[in-house]
C-alpha cells in the first residue's frame, strides 16, 4: 500500500532476460500484462524456469526500486517514476543458439517499440554470453547492440548491458580481485551501450 504506481505515460525500463513474475505485488504495480512479452511465440512470458532461478524477476525489481533499504526501515510512501516492460529472451529449458543472439535481441527491441511506439524507454540487457573471451573485439551481438543504440542517428536508444558474472569457482575472498582480472562478457564490449557491473554486501 506504500507504493504509488507510475503514471500511464511514464517512461519505462525494458528488461531483456528470463521474463518476470508479474504476480509479485512489487512488480505488478508497474508491469501491465500487455507490456510482458516473450521473443518466441510458444514461450510463457512469466519467469518460470528453474534454470535461470528468477533472474529476470530479480532484475525487474532492481530496475524498478534499486536499494530498498531506506523503505524497509521507514514507513513513508514510495513513488515510482517509471514503468516496467519485460521481454523474455531466454528459454525455460536449454539455451538459444549463439548465432541467434543478435537477431533475438533485435526482435525483442522491435517488439517493445511496436507494443508502445510513443513510450520513452531504456533497455536493460541483463544477460551475457560466457563463451570465448573476445578481448573486447566486436561480435555480431555487440555490433547489433551498437546498431540498435545508434538507430541511424534518428531513433537512438539507451542500452544498459550487464558486464557479466564472476565464476563461482573462485573463493569469495577473491571476488573483488577477480573483478579486476576478468574480462567483460559478450556483448558488454559494445561501444554505444553503457556496461554496468555491480556488487552488494547486503
Give residue ranges: language-model regions.
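Active-site core segment of subtilase-fold serine proteases
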Residues: 2-86, 113-126, 155-156
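Short helix/loop capping segments that flank catalytic or ligand/cofactor-binding pockets
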Residues: 23-25, 170-171, 196-198
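Hydrophobic residues at beta-strand termini and immediately following loops
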Residues: 87-89, 196
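Short glycine-rich loop/turn motifs that provide flexible caps or phosphate-binding loops at active sites
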Residues: 55, 163, 196
Amino acid at each position: 500500500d506504500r507504493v504509488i504506481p507510475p503514471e500511464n505515460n511514464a517512461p519505462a525500463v525494458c528488461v531483456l532476460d528470463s521474463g518476470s513474475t508479474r504476480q509479485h505485488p512489487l512488480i505488478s504495480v508497474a508491469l501491465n500484462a500487455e507490456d510482458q512479452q516473450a521473443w518466441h511465440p510458444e514461450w510463457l512470458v512469466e519467469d518460470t524456469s528453474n534454470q535461470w532461478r528468477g533472474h529476470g524477476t530479480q532484475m525487474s525489481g532492481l530496475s524498478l526500486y534499486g536499494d530498498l533499504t531506506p523503505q524497509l526501515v521507514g514507513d513513508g510512501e514510495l513513488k515510482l517514476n517509471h514503468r516496467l516492460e519485460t521481454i523474455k529472451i531466454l528459454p525455460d529449458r536449454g539455451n538459444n543458439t549463439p548465432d541467434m543472439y543478435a537477431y533475438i535481441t533485435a526482435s525483442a527491441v522491435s517488439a517493445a517499440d511496436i507494443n508502445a511506439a510513443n513510450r520513452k524507454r531504456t533497455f536493460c540487457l541483463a544477460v551475457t554470453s560466457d563463451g570465448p573471451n573476445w578481448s573486447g573485439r566486436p561480435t555480431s551481438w555487440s555490433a547489433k547492440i551498437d546498431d540498435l543504440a545508434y538507430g541511424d542517428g534518428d531513433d537512438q536508444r539507451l542500452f544498459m548491458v550487464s558486464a557479466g558474472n564472476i565464476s563461482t569457482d573462485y573463493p569469495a575472498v577473491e571476488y573483488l580481485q577477480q573483478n579486476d582480472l576478468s574480462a567483460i562478457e559478450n556483448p558488454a564490449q559494445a561501444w554505444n551501450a553503457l556496461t554496468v557491473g555491480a556488487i552488494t554486501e547486503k
